Design a protein with these regions (language model features):
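Hydrophobic-ligand binding "helix-grip"
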Residues: 38-41, 48-103, 165
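Short, solvent-exposed helix-to-loop capping segments enriched in aromatics
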Residues: 23-31, 47-55, 145
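Solvent-exposed, flexible loop/coil residues
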Residues: 17, 43, 137
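Tryptophan-centric aromatic hotspots in well-structured domains and transmembrane helices
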Residues: 21-24, 33, 51, 65, ...
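Terminal "cap-and-tail" regions of soluble proteins that handle hydrophobic small molecules
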Residues: 93, 98-166
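Hydrophobic ligand-binding cavity/cleft-lining segments
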Residues: 1-37, 160-166
Length: 166
């Protein structure tokens, strides 16, 4: 059995909570940085994400909802995904936590994937940049992946595994 891994990312975005909340909960906005989405925005509601650069689809259930601060969903294949938004002056701190079983040989790909999506989210709220999914920038993802794969983040990988085991 593959053990769960907990990945944590934190970004400070130069936008108010409501703007970032819209980007993570409104289907048209989600498509700009993540994938095609349907959202029944209520506790227990269904959320479905279809990656537009692959054949991956994630049917999920909203497990926690506290607008405009917390959205947590759970589904396969990506497990539990949690977005926490905290007002910070004229901006917002976004904490993204992903917990799912990830084999060691796939971990750097998952890290790079979420890193890429969060970069795309920041670009979208900053200037409206939408990913052209059929022609998405694989070289950008590859550069991020190479950073994770290089081993520079071994201690973070280990602490993620330890946190998941608790």
């Amino acid at each position: 059995m593959t053990p769960d891994v907990t990945l944590r990312f934190e970004r400070r975005l130069q936008h108010p909570n409501q703007r970032v909340w819209a980007a993570i909960t409104e289907p048209d906005e989600i498509e700009a940085w993540w994938g095609r989405a349907t959202v029944d925005l209520r506790p227990g509601g269904a959320m479905r994400i279809e990656w537009l650069n692959s054949d991956v689809t994630m049917p999920a259930t909203i497990t926690e909802l506290d607008p405009p601060h917390v959205l947590e969903i759970e589904g396969e294949p990506h497990g539990r995904l949690r977005f926490e938004l905290e007002p910070d002056g004229d901006g917002t701190v976004l904490r993204f936590i992903a917990r799912s079983p990830v084999p060691d040989d796939f971990l750097s790909k998952v890290q790079a994937g979420w890193h890429f999506h969060l970069d795309a989210l920041a670009d979208f709220v900053d200037d409206g940049t939408r990913i052209d999914w059929p022609n998405w920038p694989l070289d950008r993802w590859q550069a991020i992946h190479d950073t994770y794969y290089s081993g520079e983040l071994d201690s973070e990988r280990q602490s993620s595994r330890q946190a998941a085991e608790r």
